[in-house]
Amino acid sequence: IAKKAAAIQISELRKINKIFDKSFVQSIELIASCKGKVITAGIGKSGLIARKVSATLSSVGVSSFFLNPSEANHGDLGQIDKRDLLLVFSYSGNTSEISNMLRYANRFNIKIIGVASKKNSLLLKASDIKILLPQVKESDPTGMVPTTSTSITLLFGDCLAVALMNKIRFSKERFKVFHPGGNIGQNLLLVKDIMVTGNKLPKINVNKSIYDATKVIDQKKLGLVIILEKNKIKGILTDGDARRGIKYYSKDDHLKKIM
């Protein structure tokens, strides 16, 4: 059953190529030129996809948030600014909860990118840019549970984000700014991002005492001190070496003695 479901989805997802038309290009250009935020919206499974698309857009430098149409109907329409644009998802395109949001956007000339699978749907009729998703076969035994339809909608969202990255020349350096945490953040981390430089470096002259060295180690909290002679590095003294060295040397002995 699972293999059959996977096979159905793999086959149906190939239909995604049908959406890469003039409307898709226009949606990229509109989002790239947006002066406000990209507000994604949807109900049910489409709402979950809209949340994910918003999160992806945010991670690639496109300011975005998700707005629940039901909450919008009860006062949250005020979150939408005239500089924003709506990216609304509804596979059928006729979800009743989105109607008030669409009317509000049309009334105040807020641009709408509609993503649906029915050409004459409520959503696409109200949209400035119409993304017509291909109608696909669901992969469950009843053919009714949103499975393939959610997959192809999510695939559209990912393709949209990737195309936008190219349009706005999004780089690894910018991605690092938006994604400092997790495995991705670690993989993007450079030595220069964590290295200690300048006055933060624990440095001491070779003619200073072991005791002076331990004070610098304690102050800088890096576990070691760099020993200099005529501004050239002669070596390092670790916290452990300094503590152990005091057993054999006087704390007033110069560092030269233990180098």
Residue ranges and their predicted role:
Residues 23-27, 72-76, 212-213:
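Short acidic active-site motifs
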Residues 1-33:
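An N-terminal, well-structured beta->alpha segment
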Residues 228, 233-234:
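Short hydrophobic beta-strand segments in globular cytosolic domains
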Residues 32, 36-155, 159-164:
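Glycine-rich phosphate-binding loops that contact phosphosugars or nucleotide phosphates
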Residues 171-199, 234-259:
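Tandem CBS (Bateman) regulatory domains
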Residues 9, 42, 87, 160, ...:
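Terminal peptide-recognition signature
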Residues 203-221, 246:
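The conserved cystathionine-beta-synthase
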